[in-house]
Amino acid sequence: MSVLKRLESTHGRFFNRHDINSKKTSGVKWKNVLASKEKGGLRVSSLYALNRGLMFKWVWRFYTQNNSLWAKVIKAIHGDDGKVGKKTKSVFPSIWIDIVHEMESLKNQDIDILKCMKFKIGNGEHTSFWDEVWRGDITFKNLYPRLYALESCKDIVVASKLAHPCLDHSFRRAPRSGVEQEQFIALINQVQSVSLVPCRDRRVWSLEGSGEFSVASVRKLIDDKMLPEVSSKTRWVKAIPIKVNVHPWKVRLDYLPTRFNISRRGMDINFISCPICDNGVESTSHLFFSCQIVKDIVRKIVRWCDFSFMELSSYEEWVVWLSNLRLSSKLKSVLEKVFYVMWWHIWSFRNKKIFGSKNTHMATIFEDVVSRSFYWCRFRCKASFSWIDWLKNPLLVSL
């Protein structure tokens, strides 16, 4: 686990562009980055979930490749069930038992990966009627405990059980009235539509439509259970680079190291005023929405796109404004790309101005937004519009 934590730490430092020995504070909680986009994160996915997915791949193989040499060795040492799903202690070091323990640990956190393995019944000759999950989401021995207590052949297979016209043929006595009779009727109703076919029973993975196991599905299951709900669903535009998509995500959640955010964390800085306009505190909302110079750039963009300008003071207001525009979803996507590129260039200009870079001219930002957004929309979308068409109005191009 300590190795995994170090790897996660390195992963986080790389994301925040921190040196491995750096003591800089991070404005972004790593768990929020790992969370899925549906939960407001970036869906980087945790190494913890990946590691468990790779572990469980061996459990899947243990069941689906049970005639392989390694599976036979596991059965010879730990029994036919391999101790999977059981609480067990090992008196000697065992990688297999460590994997079993991890599955049990996840189950204690309400993540029962074994439940995702289902039986697809063929001839029913290799599936336990009571011990396997082959009908519904729970074993019959747990769903109908009173009937299981009456069963004289606990390891009876589905084919043998359904071969007789009545399900109580292998019971030591007939079910009596009350709970036993209620469970017996429910069992009959649950299996009466089952039809056996002349093919071998096989295990299927319920998290994939193909029925085949995938590490990615386990990874997603664990992350969805263990990672936090950050905010509303993350907006993502496929036509622009990842780094440009991440930037608006930081704008929305106020994760950027603006002067106001830095001072709020207790760090002493000489100025907290906006480095672009020198008028007002440099907060995220001011830098990208309230700054007068940024507003001038936005006015140029709305004139270019041929619609009216509206005063906005936050990311949330911008989302509402965009959603209320009477444009098709494709054109809204184009406009969203343009704004994402604009915010990216504003942040880049701000950093160059603070850290003394030369050739920082505010007048070039609009030109950079037009050219860069054209390049990404034209070539990353594989569209066919021309540079001249884009210059006239990006909302009139054909994607």
For every predicted segment, state its role.
Residues 1-399:
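A helix-boundary/hinge signal
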